[in-house]
Amino acid sequence: MTTRKQSWFESEAALKRVLSAQLGAAFEKAKPRLEKMGDGAANEGARWAQEADHNGPKLINFDHTGARIDEIDYHHSYKALQQLGYGGGIVAATYNPALAAERGTAGKALTMGLGYLFAQAEAGMFCPVCMTDGAARLLVKHGTKTLQERFVPRLASTDLSTLYTGAMFLTEKAGGSDVGQVSTVAKGGNGTPGETVKLFGDKWFCSNVDADVIMILARPEGAGPGTRGLGLYVLPRTLENGQRNAFRIDRIKDKLGERSFPTGEVTLDGAEAYLLGGPGQGFHQMAEMLNLSRLYNAIASVGVMRRSVVEALDWAEQRVAFGKKVIEHPLLTETLLDMASEQRLALLWAFRGVKLMDTVDAGGGSEQERRTLRMLTPLLKYVLGKWAVRVASEGVEVLAGNGYIEDWPMARVLRDAQVLPIWEGTTNILVLDAFRALRKEGGHEVLFAEVEKFASEAPSDVQSRVSALLDEAKHALVELSQDPKAEHAFRDWTDRAALLWTVTTACAKSLGNGSDTDVRAARRVLARHAPVGLLRKDRATVDDVRAVAFR
C-alpha cells in the first residue's frame, strides 16, 4: 500500500507564514481549505496530473450524424483535477460570497495560496483556472449588471455542474505579442456597453479552447489601427437559447508541455459577442486580465520550482551512491541549496506582488503602491519563469535517468515549465514592458525605494553588497537613458534590478520576512547571481538544505 505523502501546505513553513501575514484573522478560517488542497495536490492530484498528461484531450468535430459539434473529450483524470482546483475554491476564493470569511480582505492571497499548491501537482490546468479568474475579474470591474449576473456566479462556482470556465483569445497568425495587428472584425453595434455584435476572423493560439466565457479582442468596423482601435468583447460558447455560438474549433495544438488541457485554433463566423469596452478602452481592459495572468504565471513558476525541489530532495534523501546518501555529496548539496534558496526567494517575492494586488484592488492602495505593482508585475513574470525552467532542469538532473523518463514526474514538470517564459509575454517583451513602466510611470523610482527600504532591514553584509550593486544599477540606468540605441542592454539591467528586489524582499522584516533562514537563502542567491570572485566562500550543509526547503 502506498504511503500517503505529507500535505504540501503543512510541509512548507514559509508559505504558512506568508499566508498568515496576508490573510490576518481570516487565516484560521482558511486553513482547513488550504490543508485539504495541500493534501489533495500532493497525493491524488499528483497522480491525476500524470494521467491527464499521458491521456490528453481529443477534439471531436462531428457527431455520429455528421452534425458539427466541436466538443472536447477529456480523460476522467482531468475532470478529477477540475474538482480539486475549481471545487477546491481557487477562483471562488476571490468572488464567491460563500468564501468571504476565509478570504477576509485578501481574496487574491487565498486564491494564489490555493493555486500555488494546486500548480505543484498540475501546472497545466492552472492556466484555465487563471483564465476563469481573469474573465470574472473583467466582468466584475467593467461588465454591465446583466453580464455580471449571467456569468460571474458561474465562473466563481465550486460545483462542476454549474461551473463556467473562462478563456482569453488574443493571438492571431499575424500577431502574437504585437496585439495591434489583430484583424478580427466586430460588425454591428454603436458602442453601447453590453450590446451584441457579430465577430468574424481567426484566432491562432486559444488556451482552454472550449471555455464557456471568452474574453476576445476585435476591431469594430471603421475603427482605427493599432491597439487604440480594438474593442473587448465577451464571447459565450453557448447562446442563451442553448444553441452553439457561430465559431469553429479547427484543431487543437500538439504542445511540448501543458498537455492536459486543449489549446486550439478557432474560426469566428458571425459569432455573437457582447461589448465590454470599445476602442480606447478595450485594450487597456484586456491588459488588466493580462497582468493578472502574469501574476498567475509567476505563482505557477514558484509551484514548478517547489515541486522540483521536493522531488529532488526526496530522491537525494533515499538514493545511496558511493557509500552514502547522494544528498551528502558536497557538489549535490550545493546544487540542492541553490534550488531551495531560489524557490524560497521566488515564493516571498511573488507573494509581495499578490499583497500589492489585494491592496490596490481593495481601493486602499496609494499611488506609490499602484506604481510598484505596475513595475513589479512584468519582472515577476519573466524572472520567475526563467528560474522555473532552470530549477526544473536541475531537478531532472538530480534524478538522473529516472528524471528523464515519463514514468516519473520530473520530465513532465520540465516540459510544463518551458511555457512559463513564453505566454503572457516572452522575456524580451516583458523587459520592454518594464522599461515602459520605468519611462512612463517612474518605475525605477519605486523599485529603488523598495530595494533601499528592504535592504535597510537586512544584515550589514547583505546591506553593504546590495548598496554597491544598487549604485551600479543607478549609474547604468543613467547611461541607458542617454543612449537612444541602448535597447540591447535593457535585459542586463532588469536582471540585476530584479535580483536586488528579490533578495531584499526576503530580508524585509516589515513584510514578515527576514528570518535567519530567509536571510540564508538571500545570501545564497545573491552570491550565485552576483558573485564576488570565482570561488564560493560558504559551504552548503545538508541541514542548510533542509532548513531552507522546509523551515
Describe every region a protein language model picked out.
Residues 1-104, 465:
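Extended, charge-enriched "interface" segments that sit outside catalytic cores
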